[in-house]
Amino acid sequence: MVLPRLYTATSRAAFKAAKQSAPLLSTSWKRCMASAAQSTPITGKVTAVIGAIVDVHFEQSELPAILNALEIKTPQGKLVLEVAQHLGENTVRTIAMDGTEGLVRGEKVLDTGGPISVPVGRETLGRIINVIGEPIDERGPIKSKLRKPIHADPPSFAEQSTSAEILETGIKVVDLLAPYARGGKIGLFGGAGVGKTVFIQELINNIAKAHGGFSVFTGVGERTREGNDLYREMKETGVINLEGESKVALVFGQMNEPPGARARVALTGLTIAEYFRDEEGQDVLLFIDNIFRFTQAGSEVSALLGRIPSAVGYQPTLATDMGLLQERITTTKKGSVTSVQAVYVPADDLTDPAPATTFAHLDATTVLSRGISELGIYPAVDPLDSKSRLLDAAVVGQEHYDVASKVQETLQTYKSLQDIIAILGMDELSEQDKLTVERARKIQRFLSQPFAVAEVFTGIPGKLVRLKDTVASFKAVLEGKYDNIPEHAFYMVGGIEDVVAKAEKLAAEAN
């Protein structure tokens, strides 16, 4: 450490005289020196490298705290390690956030004095960063002046908002049948090719339009190809604007990265989202794809650290690890972080500890169905399998609850009659059942909706439908006010006025 100019060899006599005549100066100086001593970086050296695990020995008795970030200078830049265990004899065991190839024993390690910190703020919008906050989109450094540690406590009970509020998405099927809680956690179930990516993009777009909020997409164990495709699609649809302000920040911890990076990248994305909530009062949408891979990475890290596994080979701290992430996703009196988490269910076993632990935290589930997508109905949300704890008369109001229940009842009746229709035809049904089937088919098509982000592909302008309009429209259909309108007029429209306009247009074309 370089001492201040005051304390050089030539000025010791002057300093001694000043010290005797001014005790206050001496006290202040001692405090300054003590502070400087405490801020001196702790350095150590690598003693063992075992895959993603690196042991570091420190000469000083003072060791870096658990979760502190350590740095090693490498020819490629820097390698960040996170302290996981204190082994004794001044040695700590760390998890590497990148590959350890080429790392040798004896290399110098520097303690940063705090956890991994990442850039936050509007400068991150439209950019792709990795777990340690470095840009990976080849568009230069992120010019943010603010950085936040990825490890933080959840908001206190006093800060949290206790009222249950709906976060309007503008998507009819979601708002009506499985509404999202503001500051809630939603599980998104969907296989390949059912419109999951487009659904996510539309949510990002609608949150920006309806609430002026931002979104953070976190790829946990994401395939590099999928991440690249998502980035390119977002640029094409205008969600990411390279010239103006974008609506989303992307954080990727790719599938080929070490388990340490995949276990922490969700926290990096959450930290960026928390800044928009706490400092800018925004309603932020946080996407995590895939939450199972977060658990899987934690399991790998746990095994590398030598912990005894629990059921099915998962880490013994599974519930704690999940809770540390999920409890930070909440509503405060300033804003909210609403999370949509893609959930992979291993071998379709819902009792597997990983998805079972996730389900305990979810407020709603949105299920994308291949059967519905094959009918050409998009978004392909299954109205009978999707659920929400907010669909309660005390939260959404009696009218909304009654309409949603009647819609589900009508669709369920139609589903139970489909086998009879397939074998015997519509003629064998009673008049009441025929009417129910006709209305159910209209409702099924009315649950479709043109998306703004898909306009470049479909040529149909996107529609954002307000919740009160959605409830009123479906109530009118259930009451039979539009029984005279053909069912194809209900396909790919916004509100009920669009149905009427489309029906008039179709009638004019027919004449």
From Swiss-Prot:
Mitochondrial membrane ATP synthase (F(1)F(0) ATP synthase or Complex V) produces ATP from ADP in the presence of a proton gradient across the membrane which is generated by electron transport complexes of the respiratory chain. F-type ATPases consist of two structural domains, F(1) - containing the extramembraneous catalytic core, and F(0) - containing the membrane proton channel, linked together by a central stalk and a peripheral stalk. During catalysis, ATP synthesis in the catalytic domain of F(1) is coupled via a rotary mechanism of the central stalk subunits to proton translocation. It is an enzyme of class 7 (translocase). InterPro entries: AAA+_ATPase, ATP-synt_VA_C, ATP_synth_F1_bsu, ATPase_a/bsu_AS, ATPase_alpha/beta_chains, ATPase_F1/V1/A1_a/bsu_N, ATPase_F1/V1/A1_a/bsu_N_sf, ATPase_F1/V1/A1_a/bsu_nucl-bd. Keywords: ATP synthesis, ATP-binding, CF(1), Hydrogen ion transport, Ion transport, Membrane, Mitochondrion, Mitochondrion inner membrane, Nucleotide-binding, Phosphoprotein, Transit peptide, Translocase, Transport. It comes from Saccharomyces cerevisiae (strain ATCC 204508 / S288c) (Baker's yeast). GO terms for molecular function: ATP binding; ATP hydrolysis activity; proton-transporting ATP synthase activity, rotational mechanism; proton-transporting ATPase activity, rotational mechanism. It catalyses: ATP + H2O + 4 H(+)(in) = ADP + phosphate + 5 H(+)(out). The modification Phosphoserine is found at residue 373. Pfam families: ATP-synt_ab, ATP-synt_ab_N, ATP-synt_VA_C. SMART domains: AAA. This is ATP synthase subunit beta, mitochondrial. GO terms for cellular component: cytosol; mitochondrial inner membrane; mitochondrial intermembrane space; mitochondrion; proton-transporting ATP synthase complex. The gene is ATP2. F-type ATPases have 2 components, CF(1) - the catalytic core - and CF(0) - the membrane proton channel. CF(1) has five subunits: alpha(3), beta(3), gamma(1), delta(1), epsilon(1). CF(0) has three main subunits: a, b and c. It is found in: Mitochondrion; Mitochondrion inner membrane. The modification Phosphothreonine is found at residues 112, 237. ATP binds at residues 190-197. Present with 164000 molecules/cell in log phase SD medium. Residues 1-33 form a transit peptide. Belongs to the ATPase alpha/beta chains family. The keyword ATP-binding applies.
